[in-house]
A protein has these predicted regions:
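Hydrophobic alpha-helical transmembrane segments
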Residues: 2-13, 144-157
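N-terminal signal-anchor transmembrane alpha helix of single-pass membrane proteins
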Residues: 8-26
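Alpha-helical transmembrane segments of multi-pass membrane proteins
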Residues: 17-21, 157-168
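Generic low-complexity, intrinsically disordered sequence content enriched
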Residues: 23, 59, 140-141
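Polar-ligand-bearing catalytic/cofactor-coordination segments
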Residues: 26-130, 166-223
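Short, structured loop/turn "capping" segments at alpha-beta junctions
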Residues: 116, 134-135, 148
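Residue-level signal for the membrane-embedded core of alpha-helical transmembrane segments
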Residues: 129-132, 154
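Hydrophobic, membrane-inserted alpha-helices
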Residues: 132-141
Length: 223
């Protein structure tokens, strides 16, 4: 086998891993949901209340917390500004619901400190990419030309997009850290072992890593 072919095959392998990364994150998320997902918050508040408490403590009460019925809810909209929560999280009283709502409030804190950056725009692009890449891959496979080179270029693009997504994820980690600290300072996490709390905030981060799968037609069909 020629060295060039070996390199292309290696690129394709890493590209395949990049494309599978959101699904792998989703599988890890589901495992945590199965283990800890039924744990209710001891303090008894819901996702809406948790987000509002963080916003009030962060002195940004002007940020709304809205219940959203659209398919792709659960995001922070800096233009309004508002936190959009799905009904399950808005009314939810599970520890995971609270952590998810709190992480979005953490993005509002980043916005307050001018550290939000372009995360919202990037996430919208990742949803678009997650919907488009399977169709693009099929189109490339049925096209004429040199398929190995075409696949190599495609997987190189896929790997680059995934790498940038992981780099952007630093903002999500920071938002989760801010949310964790705010809830802890408000003593809303009292009564929960550290293992449960860590799992809840890990899930909020996995939500973001799994975004190109969960918020696409593939996620709707196969999860």
């Amino acid at each position: 086998m020629a060295p060039e072919t070996k390199i292309l095959l290696l690129v394709c392998f890493f590209g395949a891993l990049a494309l599978a990364a959101p699904w792998i994150a989703w599988k890890r998320l589901k495992a945590l949901e199965a283990k800890f997902g039924r744990v209710l918050l001891v303090r008894g508040i819901n996702g809406e209340q948790a987000a509002k408490i963080i916003l009030l403590r962060g002195e940004i009460p002007q940020v709304d917390v809205d219940e959203s019925h659209i398919l792709f809810a659960d995001n922070y909209s800096p233009g309004e500004p508002a936190i959009k929560l799905s009904s399950n999280i808005y009314h939810g009283k599970r520890l995971f619901d609270i952590a998810r709502a709190a992480r979005l409030a953490g993005h509002a804190l980043q916005h307050r400190d001018r550290k939000l950056g372009s995360l919202a725009s990037w996430d919208a692009f990742m949803v678009l990419w997650g919907n488009a890449w399977p169709l693009l891959l099929v189109a490339l496979l049925v096209s004429h030309g040199r398929p190995l080179i075409t696949m190599g270029l495609f997987t190189l693009v896929a790997g680059t997009v995934t790498l940038v997504h992981f780099l952007k994820h630093a903002q999500v980690r920071d938002a989760a850290r801010r949310a964790h600290r705010a809830l802890a300072e408000a003593k809303l996490l009292d009564g929960h072992p550290e293992e449960e709390i860590e799992a809840a905030f890990l899930v909020t981060r996995l939500d973001h890593l799994a975004l190109p799968f969960t918020k696409t037609w593939m996620g709707v069909m196969f999860r």
